UniProtKB/Swiss-Prot annotation:
It holds the Pfam family Terpene_syn_C_2. Mg(2+) 3 binds at residues 243, 247, 251. It comes from Streptomyces pristinaespiralis (strain ATCC 25486 / DSM 40338 / CBS 914.69 / JCM 4507 / KCC S-0507 / NBRC 13074 / NRRL 2958 / 5647). It catalyses: (2E,6E)-farnesyl diphosphate + H2O = (+)-(2S,3R,9R)-pristinol + diphosphate. This is Pristinol synthase.
Amino acid sequence: MAHETTSGRRLPDPTSPSDPTRRTAAIRIPFPARLNPHAERARQHTLQWVQETGLLTGDEATAEYDTLRLERLMAYFYPDASAGDLELAADFNAWFFIFDDQFDGGLGTRPHEIRGVVDALVGTMTTDGAPRPADVRDTPLVRAFRDIWLRSTAGAPYAWRLRFRDHWQAYLAAHVGEAHHRNADRLPSLEQFLEVRRHSIGVQPCLDFTERCGGYALPDELYRSFPLREMREITGDVVIFVNDIVSLVKELAAGDINNSVVIEREHKGCTLEESVEHITALANARTARFARLAASLPGTLADLGVPAPSREHVSHYVDGMRHVMAGNLSWSLATSRYDETGIAAVSGGRRRPWDGLTTATGTASPRHPRRA
């Protein structure tokens, strides 16, 4: 049996017994995953925050959200973060996934409407730390994003705030590009897909937060240097490929084609299992390249005369990339988002209970911007 996307494209059967999405044993991420000991505190904090901001309403929606254990993804990403920083990261991650789920239905194929959503969110990202006046027409998504933006940038160096803003703008704008991919008569090539997905995966803002948790901001010339630039791209690609393998059945059930496994199957004319093997090989080649770059980096920095404190910050930053790759895999295999429960939640036209937030206004808002 085949399934259709919202644009009528035929997709493979997501209920096939030869399910390739759990075949992650061949993925080689040679970095250990560690869990932050403050994970449960972050969970309790964020459950309260998503209700205060109006992102979730009602016990049923909150219970369904809680089964995803999204705070654990951040606890893997930032295993050494303070309790306050982890709470803020968990809030951002809650917003990220709730926002992502808005595009599982018809909105995901309407780029002009998405542009309006993006513009409203971009307008909240002031770099001077001054909050934009609230608008009575603001949605819970906008109000919640404003809250976490202000908390994240409070006291941060100006150059870091600019990078953080640029990465979030690119993340938001990429949803317009993904809508165009869904509407196109032909699937994009893998490279065309990655040009957009490298932004919509949201890894770059997460790596910015690695700096924040470490209490430093890399100088621009060091941040943009060749080794770190390529290592960031590798980190994002590995997260993309792992996500696409693990979430394949869920995305087929929802009718979404923005998945590297689906794209490679279409262009190579192979089976889903063969496509999974190919994407796995791409991920493994990238982690091997990352390891080689990381091994040569200390000597490169010393030869360039980079001061010792900056070298320590780079070491922390590189560890942060390792945490993101390893933590994403560990969390993805444990969350209910991609198991049978998560697949059923988006099958047969069903949407998550937090769908529709791009137009809902509501009245809930945080009592005050928390500082972390």
